[in-house]
């Protein structure tokens, strides 16, 4: 008992040192426990991947080849370590022949895609910027019709991974997020995604999977990091200071758009059986003696563009890739025009909400479904676009929807969640 009293007396007399020791031990224990949980997640994922690698293949079959485009600079330079610890072991254990190509500077992924050889699957390891560069480089190729059929996997290693929410289960644990995304590539289930082709008058086209933003909310989002010292109030502060500098922040443009296009019926997954020999001979003789009449070529109908002048707080052009499983009658993209009648207080509130999901339209926004759009901007002071969270100089552009252009690997669990949310 005397020893216990002596211990408590020592702790009381040296309470500052005792408090510091408790904080250090608590942090160290939490860090060790987190590392242990991450190791358990990696081990379970590797065991699941090993089951794929142990499957027997025929003597004439060859290993699947995967080309990985890795951006080591993603996630503030941590992407290479995250990939080597959490994704690379899973791919190797699954028996996939992996070729890793690392980028050295911004924009290199576009050039690498021009030189890439045919592969069984393409894996993009990085964030929104890496994904947008690879997709743009892929669809700029002369043989993009062939390469666009290659299934694509996305391993979220960046600071911003917006598309990952549509493909993988959302998790706050970085290790679990990466391992589940890598395993979904091995399982082979895919979903089709729409692509936006954005083309200026002189520039080469840029391609996007999420959308295009132009307006006040986008401009403020680029300055939020300057108010880091305000902690959780930095987003509200950035919008408040912006409203003090200029209000209202109206953006004026001329908008033309085409109506949505009806979605064609899906092709059957199963290839129909080949008819028997006698039936094929009969059809050939019938076509020989009574050849089918050739229909005259139909002249394409002129495009019916609708035009209007817009005055808006922010204009966004979005794909429907947020829920790629949802069945739609028309192939279309969504044009959203935020009302210019917002008060400064509403601007701050809506801007705070948009910092969580930048592509979410605000209440009372005018929404237009279209298959193509032309945006005519003023020659001076147009500002900048955000295309898939990447900054581009704003100019007059034409945006066209390429429906179901690419196929991405998707986890079965996330697909079920999206199907239930319809």
Curated annotation (Swiss-Prot):
Lipid kinase that can phosphorylate both monoacylglycerol and diacylglycerol to form lysophosphatidic acid (LPA) and phosphatidic acid (PA), respectively. Phosphorylates ceramide but not sphingosine. Phosphorylates 1,2-dioleoylglycerol more rapidly than 2,3-dioleoylglycerol. Independently of its lipid kinase activity, acts as a component of the TIM22 complex. The TIM22 complex mediates the import and insertion of multi-pass transmembrane proteins into the mitochondrial inner membrane by forming a twin-pore translocase that uses the membrane potential as the external driving force. Pathway: Lipid metabolism; glycerolipid metabolism. GO terms for cellular component: cytoplasm; membrane; mitochondrial inner membrane; mitochondrial intermembrane space; mitochondrial membrane; mitochondrion; TIM22 mitochondrial import inner membrane insertion complex. The keyword Zinc-finger does not apply. Its cofactor is Mg(2+). It comes from Danio rerio. This is Acylglycerol kinase, mitochondrial. SUPFAM superfamilies: NAD kinase/diacylglycerol kinase-like.
